[in-house]
């Protein structure tokens, strides 16, 4: 049990360090983007981590999915979900956290669509999109 707590605290400290704009383990910068950043063009360096945090409604079937990502320019390296507050309500709000790593220099569109997987992206009810300009 104590090992689990120590590992959890260690992981939480690592996530906090990434979110603060510091260097990640590999020495890459981390940038955090939220829904209000949609429509922006962001400048990043090859190797940088782009963290996208989007809220969803748990229990509705809707979720955020990356669509059309240019795998030569950026890759999804991790995905996690958490309750946006200390109150863990069944079917309540959920925050998704995705970490993408910038790869080859150039521009690529990072788009996340909010839809029910059985309905497909063409039935998306919301969208988040940023243009990554990788140097």
Residue ranges of model-derived segments:
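Interdomain boundary/hinge segments at the C-termini of tandem beta-sandwich modules
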Residues: 132-134
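Short acidic/polar inter-strand loop motif in beta-rich domains
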Residues: 115-122
């Amino acid at each position: 049990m104590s090992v689990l707590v120590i590992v959890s605290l260690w992981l939480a400290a690592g996530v906090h360090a990434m979110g603060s704009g510091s260097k990640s383990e590999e020495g890459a910068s981390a940038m955090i983007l939220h829904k209000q950043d949609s429509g922006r063009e962001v400048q990043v360096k090859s190797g940088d981590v782009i963290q996208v945090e989007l809220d969803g409604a748990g229990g509705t079937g809707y979720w955020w999915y990356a669509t059309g990502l240019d795998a030569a320019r950026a890759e999804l390296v991790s995905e996690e979900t958490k309750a946006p507050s200390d109150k863990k309500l069944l079917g309540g709000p959920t925050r998704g956290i995705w970490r993408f790593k910038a790869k080859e220099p150039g521009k690529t569109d990072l788009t996340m669509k909010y839809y029910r997987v059985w309905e497909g992206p063409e039935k998306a009810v919301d969208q988040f999109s940023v243009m990554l300009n990788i140097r």
